[in-house]
């Protein structure tokens, strides 16, 4: 399995790509054109009909969707553009009522859509939508293990707890690939997903204590506390990690870690000291400059 950074890049590429489906212009003549289509279908060309379909998705016009779609002769045109577009809009509005999107997708499935099109694209995007849409896709053949467990990786990385739970219920191993799910959830502080993963047995120390050390790297106070309270080992914090906290001057983070038992004196063994700069500092000390003053100049000196 790829590293967390590679999976994160893969997720970013996927979500960046699906954003190209959103470029639909506002229509001021939508209802008039739909009425014309219903009364005189021969007067409306297929491209216009398809554009009306996409616009009906934007404005959640399910009745209009049903009226329009029966007049189009290729609803799976342009590499399944319509279903991809519905899923994209559902993803953008995942926190809202999904019933209209659900019915639109169900119509396409009942019409004959192969939900596994384009290497199971539908379940990948559905994992970012409301769990009811994800369940609809799964119930109609979507592969929960598609592309090396990519659906649960997407759901975890975007904090879709209900979708993570559904995928686990459907047989996905939540601890796959050295606990990649909990690692991805921790990146943007989706604490509910992290807490759920811990509750079902995920190893908070997996990947050389990835969750805690990534939180330290980002000076993420809440995730640091969550990870430690969930059992993350303080002993895995390296001198280089401590150096990072000192470099970015975060006394709050330092105090929290010390309270939990971190021995910050291990920073004396840091391996990231640059030889040329060490030589310069050693030269200052040999000429009588107090090492404490050097530290103050580095971290506490006022600007001119």
Swiss-Prot record:
Keywords: ANK repeat, Repeat. ANK repeats lie at residues 82-117, 118-146, 147-176, 178-206, 207-236, 238-266. It comes from the Viruses. Disulfide bonds: none annotated. The keyword RNA-binding does not apply. Pfam families: Ank_2. InterPro entries: Ankyrin_rpt, Ankyrin_rpt-contain_sf. PANTHER family: ANK_REP_REGION DOMAIN-CONTAINING PROTEIN, ANKYRIN REPEAT, PH AND SEC7 DOMAIN CONTAINING PROTEIN SECG-RELATED. This is Putative ankyrin repeat protein R602. It comes from Acanthamoeba polyphaga mimivirus.
């Amino acid at each position: 399995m790829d590293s967390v950074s590679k999976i994160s890049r893969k997720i970013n590429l996927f979500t960046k790509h699906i954003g190209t489906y959103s470029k639909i212009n506002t229509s001021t003549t939508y209802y008039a054109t739909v009425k014309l289509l219903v009364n005189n279908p021969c007067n409306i060309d297929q491209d216009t009909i398809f554009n009306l379909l996409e616009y009906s998705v934007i404005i959640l016009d399910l009745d209009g969707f049903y009226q329009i779609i029966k007049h189009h002769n290729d609803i799976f045109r342009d590499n399944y553009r319509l279903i991809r577009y519905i899923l994209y809009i559902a993803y953008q509005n995942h926190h809202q009522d999904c019933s209209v999107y659900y019915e639109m997708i169900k119509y396409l499935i009942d019409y004959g859509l192969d939900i596994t099109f384009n290497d199971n694209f539908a379940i990948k995007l559905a994992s970012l939508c409301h769990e009811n849409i994800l369940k609809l896709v799964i119930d109609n053949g979507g592969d929960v293990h598609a592309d090396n467990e990519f659906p649960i990786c997407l759901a975890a990385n975007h904090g879709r707890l209900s979708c993570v739970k559904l995928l686990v219920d459907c047989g996905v191993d939540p601890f796959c690939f050295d606990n990649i799910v909990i690692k991805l959830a921790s990146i943007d502080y989706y604490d509910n997903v992290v807490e759920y993963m811990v509750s079902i047995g995920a190893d908070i120390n997996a990947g050389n204590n990835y969750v805690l050390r990534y939180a330290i790297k980002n000076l993420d106070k809440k995730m640091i506390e969550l990870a430690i309270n969930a059992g993350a080992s303080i002993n895995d914090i390296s001198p280089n990690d401590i150096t990072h906290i000192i470099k970015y001057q975060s006394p709050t983070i330092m105090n929290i870690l010390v309270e939990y038992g971190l021995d910050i004196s291990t920073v004396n063994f840091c391996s990231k000291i640059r030889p040329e700069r060490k030589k310069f500092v050693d030269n200052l000390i040999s000429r009588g400059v107090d090492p404490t003053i050097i530290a103050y100049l580095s971290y506490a000196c006022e600007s001119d």
